[in-house]
Amino acid sequence: MTDNVLLEAKNVTIRFGGLTAVSNFNLSIRGHELVGLIGPNGAGKTTIFNMLTGVYKPTEGEIRIGGEPTTEMKPYQITARGVARTFQNIRLFKELTVLDNVKIGGHIHYQYSGLAAVLHTNRFYEAEQRAESEALGLLEIFGLRSRANALAKNLPYGDQRRLEIARALAARPKLLLLDEPAAGLNTGETLALMDKIHESRDKFQVAVLLIEHNMELVMGICERIIVLSFGKTIAEGRPEQIRANPTVIEAYLGEPAEAAGL
């Protein structure tokens, strides 16, 4: 493994009872890549995300972060090593403010004792000030600073999507996993999101692995695409290669490329 490999999955398989959800999956993420993971519903995409983040443990194979096996790691330990994610179904702290949601995302970098918090020590105040400053900076990037004190539940749906990405970036990840970030967004919101993903990748020097059904977004921003069908990888390559791959069109789309937006 070379030094710039952030995450690697080797021959990863997971079974639930008699069902093989993912079979012999391989993945290597380097540097500041922007990689798409696509396939029909039930292909195993979110299951892969759950394995990469420690929610599920592979039945076979191995996942490494920075060369270190994740077999014994808890999800929070994987986050601490630089992997953050969003979810297909938005998971915000709806009763907290927009600002507090982002601050929570970065809490692993602002550790202080419970006693320090109770006594309001200088260390506590300094950590809180840094957390707020960084959180406000992220909200500025995602156009949410003016809503910092609003409750997360009161944001429009598209803003909640952006807030979830901002919260994930607060963890200062080396690799950001986005699970259907454009789900439920209209065309204008999707195009704006594409710009923000690119901007975030460049500004924070973070690699991005995203699951998405919106082919315009995937083909427009991903440098490499992996295609799954029934838990198996059926193709991998650049967008133009995937767009022209008849196996992908048949297995994933089941319709002519033009009709599918490819």
Annotated model-derived regions:
Residues 2-262:
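Glycine-rich phosphate-binding loops of nucleotide-dependent enzymes
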